[in-house]
Swiss-Prot record:
Residue intervals of the Toprim domain: 83-178
UniProt superkingdom: Bacteria
Metal-binding listed as a keyword: yes
SUPFAM superfamilies reported for this sequence: Recombination protein RecR (SSF111304)
Keyword Aminoacyl-tRNA synthetase listed: no
This protein's name: Recombination protein RecR
Organism: Beijerinckia indica subsp. indica (strain ATCC 9039 / DSM 1715 / NCIMB 8712)
Gene Ontology molecular functions: DNA binding; zinc ion binding
BP terms from Gene Ontology: DNA recombination; DNA repair
Family, similarity comment: Belongs to the RecR family.
ZnF region ranges: C4-type: 60-75
Function according to Swiss-Prot or TrEMBL: May play a role in DNA repair. It seems to be involved in an RecBC-independent recombinational process of DNA repair. It may act with RecF and RecO.
CDD domains, alphabetized: TOPRIM_recR (cd01025)
Pfam families hit by this protein: RecR_C, RecR_HhH, RecR_ZnF, Toprim_4
Length: 201
């Protein structure tokens, strides 16, 4: 184990930064040094923003999104189509779809996927409230935007079965060739999904 090269406060900062996705020990040291160099214009405001977020973040009681208000900004947006509901696994997935800005829908965050091997069952996810939202009658289409993994497929089938009694259309995101992708570089599963999801041209 290497000896510390800075005081415990800086070492702790580096250690915590290294726990962020995409940052290893070296990147964390560089980030820490950058923050220290920009103490007034970056480190101080960042510390304040983190404290504010820590104090005010709450889950939306309607959709499960994370925000500083309840209902969240998306659920409170009257311009969104209340008949379209996009079901996602995580808040990160919700944010990714929002960046695409393709559909002014509302969302429902499950908080993960069903995974019998990991002991994650229906009661561990935000599934009951999904059924309750659909039962209110305003939603006309449920778009399943879950990952194309075994657990994602299991979750999608469970949701489809759970909502079978309601007059809603259930759709899935198309899977296949990414924009700008070359067929030669795609795996067989992706190509098969693309062929099955083909559309008129």
């Amino acid at each position: 184990m290497t000896a510390p090269i800075a005081g415990p406060e800086i070492e702790r900062l580096i250690h915590l930064l290294a726990r962020l996705p995409g940052l290893g020990p070296r990147s964390a040291r560089r980030a820490a040094l950058h923050l220290i160099r920009k103490r007034t214009e970056l480190l101080g405001p960042l510390a304040e923003a983190l404290q504010q977020a820590y104090n005010h973040l709450i889950p939306c009681q309607i959709c499960g999104n994370i925000d500083t208000r309840d209902p969240c900004t998306i659920c409170a947006d009257a311009k969104r189509d209340p008949t379209l509901l996009v079901v996602v696994e995580t808040v990160a997935d919700l944010w990714a779809l929002e960046r695409a800005a393709a559909l002014p829908a509302r969302y429902h965050v499950l908080g993960g996927t069903l995974s019998p091997l990991d002991g994650v069952g229906p009661k561990d996810l935000n599934l009951q409230s999904l059924t309750e939202r659909v039962a209110q009658g305003e939603i006309r289409e449920v778009i399943l935007a879950v990952n194309a993994t075994v657990d994602g497929q299991t979750t999608a089938h469970y949701i489809t079965d759970s909502l079978a009694a309601f007059p809603v259309k259930i759709t899935r995101l198309a899977h296949g060739v990414p924009v700008g992708g070359e067929l030669d570089y795609l795996d067989e599963g992706t190509l098969a999904a693309a062929l099955r999801s083909r559309t008129n041209f």
